[in-house]
Amino acid sequence: RAIILQAVYFKLRFTLSYRDVEELLKIRGVKVDHSTIQRWVFKFSPMIEATMHKRKKHVCDSWRMDETYIKVGGKDRYLYRAVDKQGNTVDFLLTKRRMKGSAQKFLNKAIGNNGKPRLINIDKSGANTEAIRIINRHSLTFKKIKTRRVKYLNNIVEQDHRTIKRRIAITTGFKEFESAQRTLAGIEIINIIRKDQLSNSKKSWFA
């Protein structure tokens, strides 16, 4: 199990191909085929994500939301992400389209995992604006989410995008949507751990 988690960590934490990870393990005296390592990442990333949500520390109630494109099967897919004003990861969701329904699905996930924010800074996307408006309209409380469109405030989430995208820069893109979902979830989790966003941080995840 330690070897599996170590291999998964190497792939998700550093800009390495699966063959690079295979070579690193070989140097350590462990012979594992790169396709096996890929299956490990596919299998264990969702499990680690589920556990991570239980341990993630609370984020601030002021969020910065944005989306970036990811190539999957040669087509643009959209990774919705949000960080709080301190740069802590709020949540993430890969979607097939960039539209109101996708933005709403992301926000429902983010709010479900983190609670409702006081304010969300967004770009000029009409889809994001409409998604927040719908959530406010159907809210069961008087607490409404305020929106703000200050371009420089979203620099923090755009910089965070680059951290995530560097991890996949060595690849030619994902072939399948589910593989992209699972791998990106793993990369996001490692980024959350790197930011020290987990409670009981002394407990090792990859040992």
Model-derived regions, located:
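Residue-level recognition of single "structural anchor" positions
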Residues: 1-207
